[in-house]
UniProtKB/Swiss-Prot annotation:
<keyword id="KW-0808">Transferase</keyword>
<dbReference type="GO" id="GO:0043814">
    <property type="term" value="F:phospholactate guanylyltransferase activity"/>
</dbReference>
<keyword id="KW-0342">GTP-binding</keyword>
<dbReference type="InterPro" id="IPR002835">
    <property type="entry name" value="CofC"/>
</dbReference>
<comment type="pathway">
    <text>Cofactor biosynthesis; coenzyme F420 biosynthesis.</text>
</comment>
<comment type="function">
    <text>Guanylyltransferase that catalyzes the activation of (2S)-2-phospholactate (2-PL) as (2S)-lactyl-2-diphospho-5'-guanosine, via the condensation of 2-PL with GTP. It is involved in the biosynthesis of coenzyme F420, a hydride carrier cofactor.</text>
</comment>
<dbReference type="Pfam" id="PF01983">
    <property type="entry name" value="CofC"/>
</dbReference>
<keyword id="KW-0548">Nucleotidyltransferase</keyword>
<protein>
    <recommendedName>
        <fullName>2-phospho-L-lactate guanylyltransferase</fullName>
        <ecNumber>2.7.7.68</ecNumber>
    </recommendedName>
</protein>
<comment type="similarity">
    <text>Belongs to the CofC family.</text>
</comment>
<comment type="subunit">
    <text>Homodimer.</text>
</comment>
<dbReference type="GO" id="GO:0005525">
    <property type="term" value="F:GTP binding"/>
</dbReference>
<dbReference type="GO" id="GO:0052645">
    <property type="term" value="P:F420-0 metabolic process"/>
</dbReference>
<keyword id="KW-0547">Nucleotide-binding</keyword>
<dbReference type="InterPro" id="IPR029044">
    <property type="entry name" value="Nucleotide-diphossugar_trans"/>
</dbReference>
């Protein structure tokens, strides 16, 4: 299956600015992107990175500077999938399950109401990645008379946006993203019963 992996190459992951500087955020975002591409390939998909700037990586890259929604709509040709570049916990097994789920549209909701992955098999479906996109995608499918289904997956639900999300990468990740955090000095810590991260060195 063809898989678009959108990637904000310029100033990525700004919500991590209090934890990582600009160069570190760029390096960490790239590690997550490559983890996602590795998982897509291992699941039998063919990733194309939809980037806002040119990238020097092994996978095909299409540059589109437009906002996320029009950029994806312009390049999504069903049957195809969209997988966000910051679902650093994703595994080939989670993606194989997503790809195998029947339905004209298959949605993998993210925590907080986003859409972290999407399979589109029907022509005439347009994406909407603003606001509570999982709700908007369900409504769009219903309005178009398109069969939409959801996949409940922890590995696809967690996207890495906030400093507190970094703990999930160290707890559950085993790819480039987890290695990058460890090499940068991040370790798990407990604060008031909640697992967080701290940086040493």
């Amino acid at each position: 299956m063809d898989v678009l992996v959108p990637f904000a190459a310029r100033e990525p992951k700004t919500r991590l600015a209090g934890t990582l500087d600009a160069d570190e955020r760029a390096a960490f975002a790239r590690a997550m992107l490559l983890d996602v591409c590795d998982a897509v390939e291992a699941a039998g998909g063919e990733p194309t990175v939809l980037a806002t700037e040119p990238l020097a990586i092994e996978q095909p890259v299409v540059v589109d500077k437009r906002p996320l929604t029009p950029a994806i709509d312009a390049h999504l040709s069903p049957p195809a999938a969209v997988v966000m570049a910051d679902v650093a916990l994703v595994t080939p097994a989670a993606l194989r399950r997503l790809f195998a789920t029947t339905g004209d549209v298959v949605i993998a909701p993210g925590l907080g109401g986003g859409t972290n992955a999407l399979v589109v098999r029907a022509d005439g479906f347009t994406v909407d990645y603003h606001g509570t996109s999982v709700r908007d995608h369900r409504r769009a499918a219903e309005g178009a008379g398109i069969d939409a289904r959801s996949v409940d997956s922890f590995r696809l639900a967690v996207d890495i946006d906030e400093p507190t999300d970094l703990a999930e990468v160290l707890l559950h990740g085993d790819g480039r993203s987890a290695d990058w955090l460890k090499n940068a000095g991040f370790r798990l810590a407990e604060t008031d019963g909640r697992t967080t991260v701290e940086r040493r060195g």
